[in-house]
């Protein structure tokens, strides 16, 4: 049995659904929301790589690497902001984030 594009798209759809459910079901914890966003980005990258492999074009794979780089930077900055916010406020609940001042 050969693994085709339908298998990759099925796994990607499952990852995307888990990410969306993670955002909607757990709106209280910012870390879970960030992890769910990363899961959604992973599913999008899997789609890029699957279609790029199917079409024999490298553009999708290069774009997936670009998205991974941006996602890593986003996660690092988001976690750094959360660490500073937790040190100042003592909580990382979503309700407390709206009191941040620029």
UniProtKB/Swiss-Prot annotation:
HAMAP family: NDH1_NuoK (MF_01456). It comes from the Bacteria. It is found in: Cell inner membrane. Its main location: membrane. It is a multi-pass membrane protein. It catalyses: a quinone + NADH + 5 H(+)(in) = a quinol + NAD(+) + 4 H(+)(out). Pfam families: Oxidored_q2. One of its GO terms (cellular component) is NADH dehydrogenase complex. NDH-1 is composed of 14 different subunits. Subunits NuoA, H, J, K, L, M, N constitute the membrane sector of the complex. Its EC number is 7.1.1.-. GO terms for molecular function: NADH:ubiquinone reductase (non-electrogenic) activity; quinone binding. Keywords: Cell inner membrane, Cell membrane, Membrane, NAD, Quinone, Translocase, Transmembrane, Transmembrane helix, Transport, Ubiquinone. This is NADH-quinone oxidoreductase subunit K. Belongs to the complex I subunit 4L family. GO terms for biological process: ATP synthesis coupled electron transport. The chain crosses the membrane at residues 5-25, 31-51, 66-86. NDH-1 shuttles electrons from NADH, via FMN and iron-sulfur (Fe-S) centers, to quinones in the respiratory chain. The immediate electron acceptor for the enzyme in this species is believed to be ubiquinone. Couples the redox reaction to proton translocation (for every two electrons transferred, four hydrogen ions are translocated across the cytoplasmic membrane), and thus conserves the redox energy in a proton gradient.
